[in-house]
Amino acid sequence: MSEVFAAIGRKQLAHLDMWLENRRKNAQRFTSILETHQALTAPSVRPKTKHAWHQYCIKSDSPEQFIEHMGSHAIAARLVYPTPCHQHPVYSEHAQAKATFPITENLSKQLVSIPVHHGLTEEEVIRIIEALRSYS
């Protein structure tokens, strides 16, 4: 890392707690909508932990339809990990490359990420919430 990037990073660290708190608030608002949703499953957080919410991953049995729906509301949504780690070329020489991991392989096709970052405006959060509510 260059000195310039290190200096920028050090300056940004002063904002980290606020950014994480904003992400947590956004995630909680999305989770409260999804707790009773019939077609989507919210991510869970273990008790006594604090999630950083780098990604907000929603499980959908129809991810393409969900991504299209969110896109129709001008919300970026995408498959989070379309290729499971053990299937990446870099692991082709490892023993796991030939193994099957059915849960991992299934989830890689179902987990969709939506914006949760600290810079979302109130209007954007409301638009995401409305899009989540209207999806069936």
Predicted regions and their residues:
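PLP-dependent aminotransferase class I/II
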Residues: 1-136
